[in-house]
Amino acid sequence: MRRLLEPCWWILFLKITSSVLHYVVCFPALTEGYVGTLQESRQDSSVQIRRRKASGDPYWAYSGAYGPEHWVTSSVSCGGSHQSPIDILDHHARVGDEYQELQLDGFDNESSNKTWMKNTGKTVAILLKDDYFVSGAGLPGRFKAEKVEFHWGHSNGSAGSEHSVNGRRFPVEMQIFFYNPDDFDSFQTAISENRIIGAMAIFFQVSPRDNSALDPIIHGLKGVVHHEKETFLDPFILRDLLPASLGSYYRYTGSLTTPPCSEIVEWIVFRRPVPISYHQLEAFYSIFTTEQQDHVKSVEYLRNNFRPQQALNDRVVSKSAVRDAWNHDLADFLDNPLGTEASKVCSSPPIHMKVQPLNQTALQVSWSQPETIYHPPIMNYMISYSWTKNEDEKEKTFTKDSDKDLKATISHVSPDSLYLFRVQAVCRNDMRSDFSQTMLFQANTTRIFQGTRIVKTGVPTASPASSADMAPISSGSSTWTSSGIPFSFVSMATGMGPSSSGSQATVASVVTSTLLAGLGFGGGGISSFPSTVWPTRLPTASAASKQAGRTVLATTEALASPGPDVHSAPSKDSEGTEEGEKEEKSESEDGEREHEEEEKDSEKKEKSEATHTAAESDRTAPAPTPSSPHRTAAEGGHQTIPGRRQDHSAPATDQPGHVAPDLDPLVDTATQVPPTATEEHYSGSDPRRPEMPSKKPMSRGDRFSEDSKFITVNPAEKNTSGMLSRPSPGRMEWIIPLIVVSALTFVCLVLLIAVLVYWRGCNKIKSKGFPRRSREVPSSGERGEKGSRKCFQTAHFYVEDSSSPRVVPNESVPIIPIPDDMEAIPVKQFGKHIGELYSNSQHGFSEDFEEVQRCTADMNITAEHSNHPDNKHKNRYINILAYDHSRVKLRPLPGKDSKHSDYINANYVDGYNKAKAYIATQGPLKSTFEDFWRMIWEQNTGIIIMITNLVEKGRRKCDQYWPTENTEEYGNIIVTLKSTKVHACYTVRRLSVRNTKVKKGQKGNPKGRQNERTVIQYHYTQWPDMGVPEYALPVLTFVRRSSAARMPDMGPVLVHCSAGVGRTGTYIVIDSMLQQIKDKSTVNVLGFLKHIRTQRNYLVQTEEQYIFIHDALLEAILGKETAVSSSQLHSYVNSILIPGVGGKTRLEKQFKLITQCNAKYVECFSAQKECNKEKNRNSSVVPAERARVGLAPLPGMKGTDYINASYIMGYYRSNEFIITQHPLPHTTKDFWRMIWDHNAQIIVMLPDNQSLAEDEFVYWPSREESMNCEAFTVTLISKDRLCLSNEEQIIIHDFILEATQDDYVLEVRHFQCPKWPNPDAPISSTFELINVIKEEALTRDGPTIVHDEYGAVSAGMLCALTTLSQQLENENAVDVFQVAKMINLMRPGVFTDIEQYQFVYKAMLSLISTKENGNGPMTGDKNGAVLTAEESDPAESMESLV
């Protein structure tokens, strides 16, 4: 600290200060980016588009410089006269006799498993692989459907359809495109040859209930969240996605609604919508796209992906001639053309606002009528304008009849005043439209004002590149609401006025001085107020009183909200506001908590701005005069006006001139706005009017060119002080304060840096080069003793050990404390906590995950090494980078290319109570195999966790970095595969790793003596990319076993998937939380995840994965660890039979968990369809949708893909068994089709009821006659018998299934078993049949089909005991609970009685006893209990199980 007092520091300080002042004085108009004229920007934009066109890959978007108004530059057809979409006016549509019933062929069939969905970046498309044909409806022939596309709005059911009817737009529009297969072989060929194609438009309308027909689509959307993602869809029926009645439709000739906009489309627009719930709508709003501006790519939400509506021109819209179809509820449809929201507004906003000077003292305002009129006719227009002069604000509103020219002349214009104009349409009953664009005019300079930004049309916004894993986050600025606020200068400046629908107006809290400076009023900055954070309700009394005690000042940062909040098309201006207001209505009503969270976010943002450069420190804070004392408004930063009563506020505590100490003192609130207002208009003499600061210092952006017609601030840039204005005569008045402020700011920065350097130096000395360990939040009993001790206090940034090369960082990394309210949750309360998160459509999970997404937004963590040109090829994905501060550094290789040989895309990640517990990395590339194995050797890694398959959905996710057999050499590392063990959901490989450069006993060898080590790879094989596993239990088993394999002398556990973020982060969180549960009986998922997000980007990639973590942990808490070694099983069984405090045994509690499964696992809607009900013997034993065995559907027949059968997980494969019912006479062929489709070669028949009729009991053909199943025939070729030890017999049939079209043959063996399990036989005989089946299965492929009469307990028991016996053989342990629960999850209704569950335990005890005692003497009873001769203690005997 003494160095700060040395003269050289002060000399340096004075030089820097003088340089800053010289820069500010000499270049006051410089901004972050070049701001040119409108003509220049349009020219640049056109050049960029022409370049893309020349390259053969024209880029287009739904907004910005490549938005719809620019499509014509790259696709000339987009400027044609017959473009789509259009607004269809029902009363103008004529009935066409040629438009009769629509004929659909194949639409009633379920789609095949080849149908797939893709996120194209512009929409979500379904590629249809089945035959769907459309004819009729005036189409010139029989057309084949090839693809389906969707268009949607911003959020919460806002308008998103491309077409509209009578001005009514819907949340989603689905479009089905088809072509003539007689002329072309594909849809794309028809477009390229400019031939006629067809399209259907189907509207989706919000309904209170889920539409089950959409479930496969919604499930598919979750698999294509990110750009270019693809997924196969579950079977669906395309007809179910259409309206119930197809008779009412409109017809017109139009174009494609996307480039190339070819005018070749025969449109069929259905009048009736299809229902969709808000919950299902959310899947559309979660889709991401990649936006591109020049060479910069950014990941944004894909929203508002619709083209603006086009003019009808000379075209005619026709209606179908199916008259009865138009009668039903048409009146209701027309009376309310836009539903609940549109019924409140007169029309869309007036468009094409212009302000032009007529002479020195007069202006002319002109506009065009709204594109859509919801409640015609328009009676008149209201022109409102406001102006300022000599710090006094004037305002005037007048009306103009709609039948006259849409122009207004404003006389007596002063060149020294600022004028703001906007127009509103008025219909009958004083129903009004939304306001038009707000135009700002001063001294021949016109600006378009949208929302809270001044924008220049046609200029692309260059967004910073981000990852597909991170959604853009809106940071809410302080806001307040007012009921009926007048249309004052403030409401104009924020682009918001009184709501035209009579609802509460939403007004941005402040218009800061940057806006006013650019217009000649003062210096400062303008805040961005994303629509997603504007409340539409007044705060509650309690919330307002909490918020009233502090002053919140305006910030200078404009943040881009997710989705296009600045529309390029004028017709969308009001829609953005309307959609934002709709979104607010779905927000949580817990007002206090929302305001507190916004308040904290605002504080963090404002504190961070205190350290900005001098370019942003040219703002002053004028203190209010003593004659104007004020109170603060809730979170708004507004000062109340003397004499005006403030509702819902606490008594004032702040003194005049007081500034909150924790906020930026350099920010100026230029306008003072009352938190409440009356319906009366303000007058110039009203003492309650907002006051302007008496002095108007200019910012750097206080000059503008007289030649500029439009001046813009790029909303994607952070500095919004780039608006240009005239110089002010009071320029020198703020230079002295600026010097003082700059000096103080610089001193504070130097002191802060010195403190940080000192603090980090102390930590290095204390920790001897290792980071401090994370501390945990104490349990509830410890909190009183530990005080305010919190979990994961800071993010750890690492000091590498001596074996790693050191790189001097370019900048210091900030230390991020975890929020104070992040406390661990006791496990007893975790179930209740999850219930709260699931409530309100999983709103709690969404809030938590948004907080996770924001936690690193302001940290400025660098990843320069990943972006270095020499390292970019080492990254599997361009947007998944390794943070510099926590990256794993390899020892540099000798040679000329050694400079960047220390890089690998991997980061250290902390675990529970252990720093650097994991290494999170990407799936290795072939070019990085050597680096990967070097890292494993140097880090002494003994466990590899792999959570991806090499290829998924046809895409390479990871390259195989281990030898398939024998040995492979990767640089200096030789890897040998020692063994492979395959389990149902994961595979364990034991690898030997040897370093040829390390000799035994060499000093550089971390282990000191060995040059060979063993590395175990745990490879989970059932985890879908960007998704989650179907069931949590197998994942828990995988995590527990891989975690238990780690030895104390091993280095970090290496975890990777494909990108090394989503599935990798999920594993790390589950593993760490399981350790915390074991150690402290507490859980802190949110706090821990926010902590590790500072160490590798985007760990836990999706909200779905975040929810899965909670589900898995809850499963672990409820079920506990149930795997038991064979030697402990007897004592374990006795312990779970002891009644607890409530009188219930743990066995009863386990069985309750088995039978009470989560509702999402037991959905059985396919089995409950009317066409399938007759195929079920017992409606209570049907397949769950997640594990249902599907059949290849037969063409033209509905429901032919259904059979009452379920996959069951075994020990070696996830679909090792299929449990089904005894075939019914009319489902016998379905049974054999299932065998054929799934290549099953073993059938085990367990008859529960011997009273079945002969024709029903025997479902196979006789030897004399084959059974014909169309695609194949079934022939019995032999029959044999196998005697068991109890003299019972198994009848064995051998069948051959031969294809009728080719030479394929499938051999099937059928075991017709006696009564099993036999209650009259010893329990040990139970495994005799199982051993026969197991031995046969070793030589056969495909699943084993097991059936009893209903496909219930007997079949389930055989699968359970087979799996458990295999587990006992391989692991010398069993997990009865997990096996039984998995069977009940995959086929609900198998285990329904606790005695069935007890029998599984008895059988396993018998098997273990048999193995331990050899074939010693056994005594059996008829109830199935077994006693060995040596057993004498009744408490320890299996008799106690009865």
Curated annotation (Swiss-Prot):
Residues that coordinate or bind substrate: D1025, C1057, S1058, A1059, G1060, V1061, G1062, R1063, Q1101
Extracellular side stretches: 20-733
Residues with attached carbohydrate: N109, N113, N156, N359, N444, N719
SUPFAM superfamilies membership: (Phosphotyrosine protein) phosphatases II, Carbonic anhydrase, Fibronectin type III
Keywords: Disulfide bond, Glycoprotein, Hydrolase, Membrane, Phosphoprotein, Protein phosphatase, Repeat, Signal, Transmembrane, Transmembrane helix
Annotated positions of the Phosphoserine modification: S1179
Residues at the site labelled Ancestral active site: D1348
Membrane topology, from the record: Single-pass type I membrane protein
Catalytic activity: O-phospho-L-tyrosyl-[protein] + H2O = L-tyrosyl-[protein] + phosphate
GO MF entries: identical protein binding; protein tyrosine phosphatase activity
Compartments in which it is found: Membrane
Disulfides per UniProt: C78-C261
Keyword flag Glycoprotein: yes
Acidic residues bias spans: 576-600
InterPro entries in alphabetical order: Alpha_CARP_receptor-type, CA_dom, CA_dom_sf, FN3_dom, FN3_sf, Ig-like_fold, Prot-tyrosine_phosphatase-like, Protein-Tyr_Phosphatase
Fibronectin type-III domain residues: 349-448
EC numbers for this chain: 3.1.3.48
Active site residues of this protein: C1057 (phosphocysteine intermediate)
Region (Disordered): 461-480, 557-726, 769-788, 1412-1442
Cellular-component GO terms for this entry: membrane
Positions on the Cytoplasmic side per record topology: 760-1442
Tagged with keyword Disulfide bond: yes
Residue ranges occupied by any Tyrosine-protein phosphatase domain in the UniProt entry: 845-1116, 1147-1407
Domain Alpha-carbonic anhydrase residue range list: 58-321
Record function comment: Possesses tyrosine phosphatase activity.
Descriptive protein name: Receptor-type tyrosine-protein phosphatase gamma
Name of the gene this protein is made from: Ptprg
